[in-house]
Amino acid sequence: MSRRRHSDENDGGQPHKRRRTSEPLEIEDRLESLICRVGEKSTSSLESNLEGLAGVLEADLPNYKNKILRILCFVARLLPEKMTVYTTLVGLLNARNYNFGGEFVEAMIRHLKETIKLNAYNEAIYLVRFLCDLVNCHVIAAPSMVAMFESFVGVTQEEDIPQVRSDWYVYAVLSSLPWVGKELYEKKDVEMDQILSQIEAYLKQRQKLHLSILQVWSAEKPHPQEEYLDCLWAQVQKLKKDRWQERHIQRPYLAFDSVLCEALQHNLPPFTPPPHTEDSVYPVPRVIFRMFDYTDAPEGPVMPGSHSVERFVIEENLHCILKSHWRERKTCAAQLLSYPEKNKIPLNYHIVEVIFGELFQLPSPPQIDVMYTTLLIELCKLQPGSLPQVLAQASEMLYTRLDTMNTTCIDRFINWFSHHLSNFQFRWNWEDWADCLSQDLDKPKPQFVREVLEKCMRLSYHQRILDIVPATFSALYPANPSNVIKYGDESNSALPGYSVAVILTNAIKNKASDKEIFNILKDIPNPNQDDYDDEGIGFNPLKIEVFVQTLLNLASKSFSHSFSALAKFHDIFKALSESDEGKLHILRVVYDVWKNHPQMIAVLLDKMIRTQIVDCAAVANWIFSPELSPDFTRFYIWEILHSTIRKMNKHVQKIQKELEDTKQRLAKQHKHRDSDDNDEDSGRKDGPLEEQIERLQEKVESAQSEQKNLFLVIFQRFIMILTEHLVRCETGGIDVNTAWYKNCRERLQQIFLQHHQTIQQYMVTLENLLFTAELDHHILTVFQQFCALQS
């Protein structure tokens, strides 16, 4: 079938020329649209659409073969939820054009090797699975697929490689068997038994030190939190026991069996897994998230058991939909709800479990947290009669299991739940959670409710929270977000610095200059006078207190007023924060003023770091200071610390990028000079760039040193406070496992997990200076678990 447009003989030359150049592009775009949209809603059946599309592509192969190959390789990698549709299409094309089938298989192998070398291991899994399904479509011969699996499993015998490398190749084999296991066993049962025996032996000797640091819950009831390879192995074993029969994979190629079975098959070329290099970054291990079982969905279809391969297939397909459509929540929600096998399963329960599984995934979710929030809101809008009830049931389950829930996951639960409530008028039956009122405030349940209400207030206002939450919860109400000023009341007139604060207030109101402000502050006596020279130069806590308290009070009307005040008096802040003690005291005063308004503290500190009034290390030291111990387990404290670390990391990355860009510019100049020998000025042009590179290298080294120091400060403080707790418990005969200890230890885990890519650079330093063999095993285990993630 040809879709070329033929011009009339009377057409002028120029229009004809224009059409001739644009016509191939139009056809290529149409081919891409046809391939990408096949299998979507249509008046005709999938089978007839596939047959028609195969005819169109066959007719266009002479002119657009390379384009068609590129598109098919693209959809194999990036549209895995429609994999069997595309394998069927390739099967039909192979039956019509054997040479094209061979070229496609070769292109897929090239793509697979390139994808692995680029560390795109999730996409590589989809390519392996696609190749496996081509066995079902009679494109690839089963023996050559078995040979590829043998080479994959052979990686487990390699020496001096990280376990995560072997894990990935084993997972690639096991996760493909639901699609191709039956076909391979029919053709090569002895070889497949050997492969599975090798995998079993590998799994038995495999280290799983990382397991507990990745689990959402520490308790094994009601659902075990299994390591991903262990769970998949159990599912494959059950599938094998059931003679490789599964009921949830859409297999459109069965309708074309009479055509496909006549096609000639291709042998895969011998596949050697790309070797391990220093640049190889493998996926970290996972824990399989379980929230529901068949008892939770009493009506309608039964939920498959946790070790049935159907559960794996359903979850894998839903994960694929999320991966393909996460950028557009409406499309994503519609795709999830139109899941092909939805009538066979309790779909809403599966969707909610998969979404929460991704949201709570450690070290980090596949997508940004807010995506899951907006997606669940969209799903509730599309299914108002059923999905909100499942979501409420899930929320209740999560609440009841808070005592054993990982602190990082509790943070994400708080963020999601408060954001979700804000989109539904904050409606919730709070009385159902009244059991938290009889517990100590440091326990997970009352802490959770308090933090949710704090977040809800950020998304509304204080009085609204008091109106919607019963008065019985008053102990957990957020504080009225007003400031606390020492010098704002005449009853405090006897306080040191009060009279200066009054003068300073009037001066700022009258738009005094920095010089005038400095002259006023000069009159404040220094409590540390004896420690400094006679002029009182140096850290003066009272001077800082009077200035910062006064300024923040005058600028307390809004965030914008506070930002303007910081900008206007930036030079004064810089002068007061010259020393480390000065920086720390500024942070203490900010906390004293705004202790009832955590959000204000967070945004002010963010601004102060950006404007270099304080540095990241000062914020870290402040967080672990005794003054902050009452709020140490509060959510906002850790928001501030992680935000501080991220700012430091971005600063380093920015300078590194500048350095790389400059090096590339210099390399281009050298290349240009080499190609133009007559350019006598080119040597002189290199000079400024080389000097710039030298300066940037110094900046990178300085920034990395600052970054390393920040992590050293944080981990050192963690070790100190945890050690103090352990010693105190040991000497007092008290149980170590208090609510505070669980929270603190899991916050340490959180630092490692959320910033694991950066921390990896400083592992040797951390191991030599802080996490030594002499350290208490309660603390050292956290470091060892982190190391196991990439070992």
Swiss-Prot record:
Localization (cell): Nucleus; Cytoplasm
Sections of the chain in a coiled coil: 641-714
GO terms, biological process: 7-methylguanosine mRNA capping; mRNA export from nucleus; nuclear-transcribed mRNA catabolic process, nonsense-mediated decay; regulation of mRNA processing; regulation of translation; regulatory ncRNA-mediated gene silencing; RNA splicing
Stated name of the protein: Nuclear cap-binding protein subunit 1-B
Pfam families, A to Z: MIF4G, MIF4G_like, MIF4G_like_2
Superkingdom of the organism of origin: Eukaryota
Stretch list, region Disordered: 1-24, 664-687
Keyword Cytoplasm: yes
Subunit structure: Component of the nuclear cap-binding complex (CBC), a heterodimer composed of ncbp1/cbp80 and ncbp2/cbp20 that interacts with m7GpppG-capped RNA. Component of an alternative nuclear cap-binding complex (CBC) composed of ncbp1/cbp80 and ncbp3.
Function: Component of the cap-binding complex (CBC), which binds cotranscriptionally to the 5'-cap of pre-mRNAs and is involved in various processes such as pre-mRNA splicing, translation regulation, nonsense-mediated mRNA decay, RNA-mediated gene silencing (RNAi) by microRNAs (miRNAs) and mRNA export. The CBC complex is involved in mRNA export from the nucleus, leading to the recruitment of the mRNA export machinery to the 5'-end of mRNA and to mRNA export in a 5' to 3' direction through the nuclear pore.
Biological source species: Xenopus laevis
Gene Ontology CC: one annotated term: nuclear cap binding complex
Family from the record: Belongs to the NCBP1 family.
Domain MIF4G: 28-240
GO molecular function terms noted in the UniProt entry: mRNA binding; RNA cap binding
